[in-house]
């Protein structure tokens, strides 16, 4: 496995690589969810590149950029064991040099859910991902379903800007008890971690009601909210039943509906989602 530290070196490497390239963009502190993306790339692509970059521009002024968990030595060992060919781990100064002043601003898909609660977040995400696509020139890029809104926005960006990359989504990887894997889970106390299982239970409630032929979004949304509110440690940010292509809130749920939830447990904010069909 080769480690690349600079943009110039990565661009030079691209000219030397033969065969399809798969990109797994990460912010490090890897878990099994990231490794599932690596395995998907290994199945389809001759060359797999993983990036490790904690992107400051997608964090708000009162968010956890400085506290975001980092362990590069551990990450590198995990990626090497997973068979990654190249790791791109640039510095903030190289990705955003002095005078940097160009941004990719997503459109309507950022106006709800995460975008409404975290202003500017998706501008930072789209800008750094566009830069990674331009620097690495992957044939495919792999993202997890847990950040579903991010996946939709990046897929739209790649299409709108004619970026020659296929944006792929892989299912959420969960712990045995249903908690969606997230680098931020490390922030949780034992009690908060137990409380956080309520997000998964709320999603299962939505799917169960849909399976029982309940199609009224208002009814399902209330049941989901009741499940989460029953946990005293949970502070809800949103409970959404949205069309999976547009993220528009649904009045009547269908096989094209996705349930999305976000809540805070102590100082830790978690998100999760589930397709109803």
From Swiss-Prot:
The pathway it acts in is: Cofactor biosynthesis; (R)-pantothenate biosynthesis; (R)-pantothenate from (R)-pantoate and beta-alanine: step 1/1
Q: Which residues take part in binding beta-alanine?
A: 58
Write out the annotated subcellular location.
Cytoplasm
Please tell me where (R)-pantoate binds in this chain: 58, 150
Give me the residues that bind ATP, please.
Answer: 27-34, 144-147, 173, 181-184
Active-site residues are 34 (proton donor)
Catalyzed chemical reaction(s): (R)-pantoate + beta-alanine + ATP = (R)-pantothenate + AMP + diphosphate + H(+)
A single MF term (Gene Ontology): ATP binding
The protein's superkingdom reads Bacteria
In its keyword annotation, does this UniProt entry include Ribosomal protein?
no
Tell me its EC number(s), please. 6.3.2.1
A GO CC annotation recorded here is:
cytosol
Q: What is the enzyme's main class?
A: ligase
| Keywords associated with the record | ATP-binding, Cytoplasm, Ligase, Nucleotide-binding, Pantothenate biosynthesis
SUPFAM superfamilies recorded: Nucleotidylyl transferase (SSF52374)
Where is this chain primarily localised?
cytoplasm
Q: Where is the signal peptide?
A: none
In the record, biological process GO terms are: pantothenate biosynthetic process
Q: Does the keyword ATP-binding apply?
A: yes
Family assignment from sequence similarity: Belongs to the pantothenate synthetase family.
Further facts: The reaction proceeds by a bi uni uni bi ping pong mechanism.
What job does the chain carry out? Catalyzes the condensation of pantoate with beta-alanine in an ATP-dependent reaction via a pantoyl-adenylate intermediate.
What NCBIfam families would the database entry show?
panC
Subunit structure comment from the entry: Homodimer.
* Designated name of the protein: Pantothenate synthetase
* Species, as recorded: Dehalococcoides mccartyi (strain ATCC BAA-2100 / JCM 16839 / KCTC 5957 / BAV1)
Provide the organism lineage as a comma list: Bacteria, Bacillati, Chloroflexota, Dehalococcoidia, Dehalococcoidales
Instruction: State the encoding gene.
Output: panC
